[in-house]
Amino acid sequence: MFAPGRPLRLVSSRALGLAIPAAALVAGVTIAQLDGGADFLTALAAVATPLLAAGAGWARGWRLPWLPALCVPPLYAVAWLRPEAWSSDLAGVVLIGGACLAITGLVAGVAPRSWLTAGLVLLVVLDVILVWGERQVEPTMNALQAAAPPTIGRPLPELQQVDFGSATMGWLDFAAPALLGLLVQRRFAAGVATGLAAALWGLLLLATSPIAATPPVLVGLVVGRTRRGRLPILSSPLRSRTHEWIHSRRLDAPKPPGS
């Protein structure tokens, strides 16, 4: 969320901006529930995650694009060689987070920001439907949890989902705030708002599990796209007409006697 980004503009497609976030969620859920699909995604994640994380600097347009590539090998070694340690969970979180930064940086290079914003909102809506409506996410998580990564001497790191202690999150739960960071003007305020909203949203786990983890990014989206002194929910043309109406009302207001 707080990571800066100036992604390269590759192409500009409104359809891609609207479709990619939601399509990624649907594809992941569908593949994981196919025969052998969870094993495929697990093997793909074990290999592709470090490669994507290493390219995060280039995908996001950082000043030191090579820095993530230097950090990836030791992180991957920790996740691979110490699978039972808490440091392995932490390394996995960082690697998956870096991969999500890279993916969202690439996605931001192929679609206008406004349509990516609509795509992010659509992703949140679909996430809620699949978690609480269609109940498709829990079987997917269970299938990925049971899948084993390929073995090269010892099993490769399990990077198909984010595991930290007893908490489990999907890739898109990380990708959503990573994409949000590229869509808002006030990134720090959006990050703080998303974090606070996520902490309150997490209280739902006391009543039900699993829960959709992406809705808090909508709070960050509203806060991050709000300019100081501006009406956050109005578009620019509507905001201008609103200000003109207020100004005209002030001019038409009766003046006090003696003024």
Regions found by a protein language model. Name each.
Residues M1-P257:
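A membrane-topology feature that recognizes alpha-helical transmembrane segments
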